[in-house]
Amino acid sequence: MAEATTAENTQTGILGWVERTGNKLPDPVFIFFYLIIALVIVSIVAALSGVSAFHPTAIDEATGSALRIDAVSLLSPENIQRLWVEMPATFTHFHPLGYVLVVMLGAGVAERSGFFAAGMSKAVKSAPKALLTPVVALVAMLGNHAADAGYVVLIPLAGILFAAAGRHPLAGIAAAFAGVSGGFSANISPGQLDALLFGITEEAVGASALDPLWTANIAGNWFFISVMTFVYLPIIWYVTDKIVEPRLGPWKGGATAGAQADDMSPDPADERGALAAKGLRHAGYAALFVVALWLLMVFAPGTPLVDEAACEAVPAADCSIHTQLAPLYRSLVAAFFLLFLLTGWAYGRATGKIRSHRDLVEMMAESMKDMGYYLVLAFAAAHFVAMFGWSNLGLISAVHGAAAIQSTGLPLPLVLGLMVLFTGLLNLFVGSASAK
């Protein structure tokens, strides 16, 4: 024990500094509490100093000029009353809370029924040996919808399959880990993380008070995450096959336990064999049903997910197809909930994992147990975001921040690049997406 402690304390270099610094950071929940304390102090100083900004769009009806927004102390009687009286509403109205919990109700069933694990296993084991590395990397990236199943199932499975193909298992483990962890935010479809982040984005915009009616779309990051899937894929493939595996040397251990060098198909006696194939087939039918249902609600008469009257209340120049499709975008959280729920239920029924509705309810309840820490974090984050808005510092900082960036004369791509670099640096110390 003493040796391990000594080794940890003597780590040098940039990675050692990053690890030591990260370990010294408090829990993300307390980071938010410390930020709230700092916010209270800043709001008092700003209010006493008369800090203000002019709203970029709102007009003061009394003067006809831009509306002036003054900083408000969080220790004012109104804000103290709001803190205690509205505490339940502040927590429950936190947008990411509802979005994430709804999606996880369905994803929890898909994970606990074995659907995610079986789907990843089937995809990887069906890969030609020549394409084993890119298939492992791709399935690993897609597996971020499966939460911990990507780490628990795919990483060791990749090692077994590489050994069965006569390749070094550590190369397979490296490729799978790079896909699961390094490609965590790359996918061909939105998922739980997108539900979390677009909810936080809505809260941030709401706190700025720039546009209270603005809403985000869970598919807003889809272009980025889908493109990054195919950017990461060749990189992982090249690094694994051309850099990592040659350094490991030839594999002389033969096929590992549970795998045969000339047979990479699942054991028919295994649940992930013939029985799993039946479950995956039923899950596919369930997925087609959900897709058909959403298409029906978009194109069928009545079009409940298309607001055909949306353009009647806005000028023709401001109306677009996206305005009319707003209900469809807002329904995607429910769509992913239903997709994960029905595919997991269909798989579980076919394999015997779910024998009655009680098993289904138990899986949903278990998934909510796993969200306990997130609920605590959401409570702290919700109050920080809300208090930021109550103090008017959100709008004031947004207006003055935009003016400061504009005054530098830096081109927008460079500003965005600096933001990406800052976020990447922050990732080394704070792993939680919601905490960042």
Please report, for each region that a protein language model flagged, where it lies by residue.
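Juxtamembrane interface elements at the cytosolic ends of transmembrane helices
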Residues: 11, 113-119, 234-268, 295-312, ...
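Interfacial loop/helix-cap signal at membrane boundaries in integral membrane proteins
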Residues: 13, 52-96, 207-217, 300-328
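Hydrophobic core segments of alpha-helical transmembrane domains in multi-pass membrane transport
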Residues: 32-48, 100-108, 139-141, 179-183, ...
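Intrinsically disordered, low-complexity non-transmembrane regions of multi-pass membrane transporters
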Residues: 1-24, 53-75, 245-279, 309-317
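Hydrophobic alpha-helical transmembrane segments of multi-pass integral membrane proteins
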Residues: 100-102, 128-159, 164, 375-384, ...
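Membrane-interfacial loop-to-helix junctions in multi-pass transporters
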Residues: 89-97, 124-135, 169-171, 326-334, ...
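Core transmembrane alpha-helical segments of multi-pass membrane transporters/permeases
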Residues: 28-33, 37, 41, 62-117, ...
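Membrane-core helix-loop-helix motifs of multi-pass transport proteins
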Residues: 19, 23, 27, 155, ...
